[in-house]
Amino acid sequence: MKAAFARYRLDFINPAGTSRGVLYKKDTYFLKICDEQCPERFGIGECALFKGLSAEDNDGYEDKLRELCHNISQGVDTDLSAHSSILFGLESAILDFSNGCRRVCYDNGFATGDYHIPINGLVWMGTKDEMIARIDEKVNAGFGVIKLKIGAIDFEQELAMIRHLRTRYTDKDLTIRLDANGGFTPDNVGERLKRLSEYAIHSIEQPIKPGQWEAMAKVCEESPIPVALDEELIGITNPMMMMSLLRSIRPHYIVLKPSLMGGFSGSTDWLKMAAQFNIGGWITSALESNVGLNALAQWVAMLQPRIPQGLGTGALYSNNIDSPLEQKEDYLWSNPEKMWHLPEFEWINVD
């Protein structure tokens, strides 16, 4: 077997605002594996490094990719316990190769176009008027569940926006999920959650910054809004630590991003452990291109989700990879009449 990797820069169509700043571009990597005797047929996976959020965001990232590619050619295993995004890319590439190099990681109803995955509509941070306009656009497109990024602008403005939203859409018309990205503090989180709870909020992700287990446990116990852990899970791959976190904090939900949380294998472990505590959850993308989103969606389809997932990010980029993926109202599906068109990547081969 032989492996190579390539860099690729994704450009946002519109700046994406979060509590950590505004995103204009995102660098990602692709990994391919092939048989040396037939290099034109290869499995591909996306190593979706998330700068500023991934635990593996450091200067040694490409060195790890080189090590992996070299080890694959030598038939040697590579320790990827601290590199979730590379593990996600490797798992995807191996699965794709095993399924005939057809961009199929899991050969199920989603891959054939027969199964559609329910998704929420993501609304990025902006001014009150900008966010209301984006929400209206999502509702008009058919979304029944909206996820709002909050925590970047003045809280009173955000509250006014949600209040205004509820005057137009009841909780029967529209389900609202919130994602604070750790934007609140232990001192103000209780009062803010109480005020937000007046507007029939489904859940709020990561209300305070990760790493404050005792404070987060208190939030989960006292919050009038169900709390979901997101960033709290990043970088934790030891099974004992995973179990300890869930037992200590007892969130209502976990939100899994396989690129950041141990790939498919690690995320499966999180789901199994969460089930032991009756903790629910859903899956979201980590701003992957269509290559990563496709692999992720095929995996999610195996779970047969009953609630909307966070997989609606394929339309964010002006230079995304042409693929069969399409959004149809509030569903993601794979159109069997469309083909993959990979760009001419500049593959970096490692001996």
Question: What label would you give each PLM region?
Answer:
Residues I153-N294, Q298, Y317-K328:
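Catalytic core of soluble alpha/beta enzymes
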Residues C69-V76, H252, F277-I283, P305-I307:
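A short pocket-lining beta-strand/turn micro-motif at the edge of beta-sheets
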Residues D96-G100, A275, Q298-A301:
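Short glycine/serine- and small hydrophobic-enriched flexible loop segments
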Residues A286-D351:
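C-terminal alpha-helical cap/extension of soluble enzyme domains
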Residues G121, V255, G310-L311:
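Structural signal for conserved beta-strand scaffold positions within catalytic alpha/beta enzyme cores
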Residues R9-D11, M125, L233, L287, ...:
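Short, solvent-exposed coil/turn elements at secondary-structure transition points
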Residues C47, Q206, L311:
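Active-site donor-binding loop signature of nucleotide-sugar glycosyltransferases
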Residues M1-I176, N181-G183, S197, D322-D351:
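N-terminal capping/lid subdomain adjacent to the active-site entrance of alpha/beta enzymes
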